[in-house]
Amino acid sequence: MSTIVFSHVFFSYGTLPVLTNVSFTCGPADRLVVVGPNGIGKSTLLALAAGRLQPDSGTIAGPALSATQLVPPIHRPAATWSAPGVPLASHPPLAGDRESRTVAQLIDAATSGTRELAARFDFLTEHLARDPSPRDEAEYDRVLAAMITRDAWTIDTRLEQTLEALDLGGLDRSRPLASLSPGQRARLRLALTLVDRPEALVLDEPTNHLDTDGREHLAHTIDDWQGPVLMTSHDRAFIERTATALLDLDPTPWRAVAISQGEPADFGAYRVGGSYSDYLRDKAAARSRHTAIHADQQAEKRRLVSHQRDSTVVGHARFKPRTEIRMAQKYYADRAQTVSTRRINDDSRRLSVLAAREVPKPRYDEGAVSFPRVIRTTTGGTSPHPHAMGIALAVRGASVEGRLAPTSFEVRYGEHLLVAGPNGSGKTTLLEWIARGAPSGAHGCVDAASGVVLVPQVLPRPGDPLIPENAWYLGIGEAGKGFVPPAAWNRPLGELSAGNQRRAQLAFAARADAQILMIDEPTNYLDLNALESLEETMREWEGTLVISTHDEWLITRWWGHLHRLDERR
């Protein structure tokens, strides 16, 4: 069976180190999820695993770098790789989309390897019946094994079932790829990746654009996969459901524990077995140990330095010996010098041992997200929450033909509401109506307090009302405090990573004097650490909050009111 093995892998883009001394194994039964902050190198690691990039040093073994001609003369890599948010098989027929191609042409190209394999199998079967030879029999055995691995006999059935499960069953196959939405294209490529049955499955954010049924189908497929699965995801419920282990590319707390114990600590990734919940507990415990170790070490360091300083003085500094003991002064001075020197040397040795195992200061709060506790209104006074009474938002029979089924609810000042519903149920339509007014074809009534601020689900663009114009040229400045790392404050907004652009949106929204703060898909683009931090600060925030999300992890742990939209429109 296939196994992906990284051994002391280093990789950089030019002079910028990305991966440093990364080692791990992903075996046939592993569903290994790579996690870490935005920009740390998760997608780069997947590209290395699929053979699309070569490491600076170290070795990578596995299907992507093993013999790609499993069944001559059929040429196809044995692994599959998916670009961020756009699952994409790595074999040549899918390498790069041509917008003029149709859905049918893409499907034909993606399944051509399996169909060629089946044709080769039929040819060998007939040929061996007429003129058998040891060479042909050996090839027949290899082809048969590959047919079984790929389940080639059921490719048409599996194709239809997978397209249906990913909400593509009714897709017109004569349509050009350019006419598909980004979500449709992403789901189509994911479907073709799964149908192709590579030896190893390598996926980057595979649940993007999937509804609940699609995520469940993908989870079942991964459970049943005959081979290693290596992937990244920010979908915590999906990770909880599928992962057998997580690989953290930010091993800071585990390094600190290793340093304190005198063990090697130059590893660039740390593996935690089990589910996402197991990972959270392990990471929290490691961070707690790191914090406690640092505090104990600093206290011991201060004690040793103080003792070393005091050891230079024996007795009382202002004491003058009496006449009768002056004769012994040299004797006592020599003895004091010996004691002092021994104490100083002992302290120096202890300080050297401590320095060898001294851990860096924990800085786990620096990447945290935090809303201001007091929000001011545009008139200069404090906002109505948390003390004001009454209704901040009332929705009465609101509907939009073909986009939003009739819905009604109320939100009082200081309350938190989560709007849930399947893809296409109108979550975004509803939030945009509340923030910007009724769209064409709207019916019913929406009455909201003045000062509604909406963070859209997409990344910011020039001209967005939430973003000051100068942020695109000068950066977000101190407005990013509590959201964006200080090193990114003075960089133009468009140069920031997707995760930091999302943080910037949240930062401006939190400081926008909002009577009602609305966030459409708050978990989009954020890494797992940021997601956990954002949830904590939203939970503690005293303002009026309305969010929409498909994040099942957040929905099942939601602390406020929950309103589900009807799929019928």
Place the predicted regions along the sequence by residue.
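ABC ATP-binding cassette signature C-motif
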Residues: M1-R289, T377-R569
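Flexible nucleotide-interacting loop at or near the entrance of a catalytic core
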Residues: P132, A138-E164, G169, R287-R403
